């Protein structure tokens, strides 16, 4: 093993050099990428506050917009004629997927995609954010139960003499069949129009591991969730990336349960990818810089539990999302800038560089380092005794300077193994595949 480890005795990295490798496809052969999905250009345009993420090796659209060449997100009102119910129970575009026109939806979606992504060779992230209903009947609880109620009512109106169990079974089949047609059809159209885009739905898969108050909380997906997710194989098969949410609920603050929560949510994404027959399907969890629905920034240990945990499991990257509400005032923009400059940015540089160095040292530069199950707490963070972050004279990207010691490399080999990129194989990804 020691013979394989690369003798990186004087490896110097600068973010400028790393960023130059981005042109072309966004993710291939890139161990870990942080994508900025925030409208922070408002901070500059409206408040004169420049939240500069480029110096920390973060990928952002020109002008830091929600939609651009590197990252485009479609909310429900921006793609086709998504059917849903308002909070007052009023149907929009038919309310139910089985009560709406898929043909009309795809026709409008065709135009919406061409307008939002004009470049035919678009190779960025293409995320669809539909949250009103879920494609599995069993997952539509609480406020989403209206979709089950209205589905039953639709069948009952057509067959008033049917018994309740028959109505339930047919309503479930109709809803799930229509939900599949809508979601799969939308992905298929996106892939046909922009075939290099990383198409996928935000929030899928979900682990539903929200039982934080349990005294024996482990973070594992509750019983039955994996079986339900396995029924969504058609969704994983049509997706070109998976975008699970690892937003930190506010109730987790100070509990010490965050790492378990994130660990199993990210692991479920990798599990469904393998189950769907595509172990190389990119996983890019969505992360907020705040605890969800608060203005409390994630402290450093929670960044380790979210970004760091994702990188350690071999995620292709993360998507950092910031609500427009967090950029409404000059004070909030200044707070984001300070957090980026002092806490978030240096951490991103640390974990991104750690993933790259591990890939080079352990995986011949042809794969990602993935944490071994025997070391569930290991992270791809640089040894502060070996590396330092330095300002570039006159501004510009920060420089990460240092060298991997033999001890650093040996520890990586103990704690991590390789997941090879497509086209490479062997324990250290040193051989090209024959297929």
From Swiss-Prot:
pH dependence: Optimum pH is about 3.8.
Disulfide bonds: 43-333, 207-221, 358-369, 363-418, 420-429
Stored Pfam families: Glyco_hydro_56
GO cellular component entries: cytoplasmic vesicle; extracellular exosome; extracellular space; hyaluranon cable; lysosomal lumen; lysosome
Main location: secreted
Gene Ontology MF: a single term: chondroitin hydrolase activity
GO biological process: carbohydrate metabolic process; cartilage development; cellular response to fibroblast growth factor stimulus; cellular response to interleukin-1; cellular response to pH; cellular response to platelet-derived growth factor stimulus; cellular response to tumor necrosis factor; cellular response to UV-B
PROSITE patterns given in the database record: EGF_2
InterPro entries the record matches: Aldolase_TIM, Glycoside_hydrolase_SF, Hyaluronidase
Keyword annotations of the record: Disease variant, Disulfide bond, EGF-like domain, Glycoprotein, Glycosidase, Hydrolase, Lysosome, Mucopolysaccharidosis, Secreted, Signal
Record-listed E.C. numbers: 3.2.1.35
EGF-like domain span: 354-430
Chemical reaction(s) catalysed: Random hydrolysis of (1->4)-linkages between N-acetyl-beta-D-glucosamine and D-glucuronate residues in hyaluronate
Annotated glycan sites: 99, 216, 350
Span of the signal peptide: 1-21
Localization (cell): Secreted; Lysosome
Active site: 131
Disease: Mucopolysaccharidosis 9: A form of mucopolysaccharidosis, a group of lysosomal storage diseases characterized by defective degradation of glycosaminoglycans, resulting in their excessive accumulation and secretion. The diseases are progressive and often display a wide spectrum of clinical severity. MPS9 is an autosomal recessive form characterized by high hyaluronan concentration in the serum. Clinical features include periarticular soft tissue masses, mild short stature and acetabular erosions, and absence of neurological or visceral involvement.
Name used for this protein in its record: Hyaluronidase-1
Organism expressing this protein natively: Homo sapiens (Human)
């Amino acid at each position: 093993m020691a013979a394989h480890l690369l003798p990186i005795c004087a490896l110097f990295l600068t973010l400028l050099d790393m960023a130059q490798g981005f042109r072309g496809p966004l993710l291939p052969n890139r161990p870990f990428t942080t994508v900025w999905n925030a409208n922070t250009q408002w901070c500059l345009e409206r408040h004169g506050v420049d939240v500069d993420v480029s110096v920390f090796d973060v990928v952002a659209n020109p002008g830091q917009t929600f939609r651009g060449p590197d990252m485009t997100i479609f909310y429900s009102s921006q793609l086709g004629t998504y059917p849903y119910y308002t909070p007052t129970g009023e149907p929009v575009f038919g309310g139910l997927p089985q009560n709406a026109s898929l043909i009309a939806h795809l026709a409008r979606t065709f135009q919406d995609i061409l307008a939002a992504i004009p470049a035919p060779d678009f190779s960025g992230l293409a995320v669809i954010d539909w949250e009103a209903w879920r494609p599995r009947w069993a997952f539509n609880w609480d406020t989403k139960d209206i979709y089950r109620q209205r589905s039953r009512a639709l069948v009952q109106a057509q067959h008033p003499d049917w018994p309740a169990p028959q109505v339930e079974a047919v309503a479930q089949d109709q809803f799930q069949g229509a939900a599949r047609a809508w979601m799969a059809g939308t992905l298929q159209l996106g892939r046909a129009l922009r075939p290099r885009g990383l198409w996928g739905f935000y929030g899928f898969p979900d682990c539903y591991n929200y039982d934080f108050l349990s005294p024996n909380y482990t973070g594992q997906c509750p019983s039955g969730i994996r079986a339900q997710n396995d029924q969504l194989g058609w969704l994983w098969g049509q997706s070109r990336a998976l975008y699970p949410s690892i937003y930190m609920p506010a109730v987790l603050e100070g509990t010490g349960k965050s790492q378990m929560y994130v660990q199993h949510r990210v692991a479920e994404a990798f599990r469904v990818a393998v189950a769907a027959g595509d172990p190389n399907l990119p996983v890019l969890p969505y992360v907020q810089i705040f605890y969800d629905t608060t203005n409390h920034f994630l402290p450093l240990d929670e960044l380790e539990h979210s970004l760091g945990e994702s990188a350690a499991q071999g995620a292709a990257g993360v998507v950092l999302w910031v609500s427009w509400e967090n950029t409404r005032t000059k004070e909030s923009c200044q707070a984001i800038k300070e957090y980026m400059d002092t806490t978030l940015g240096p951490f991103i540089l640390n974990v991104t560089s750690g993933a790259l160095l591990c890939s080079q040292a352990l995986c011949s530069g042809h794969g990602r380092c993935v944490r071994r199950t025997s070391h569930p707490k290991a992270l791809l963070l640089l040894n502060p005794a070996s590396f330092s972050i330095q300002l570039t004279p006159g501004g510009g990207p920060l420089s990460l300077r240092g060298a991997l010691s033999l001890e650093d490399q040996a520890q990586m080999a103990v704690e991590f193994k390789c997941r090879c990129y497509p086209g490479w194989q062997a324990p250290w990804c040193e051989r090209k595949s024959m297929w």
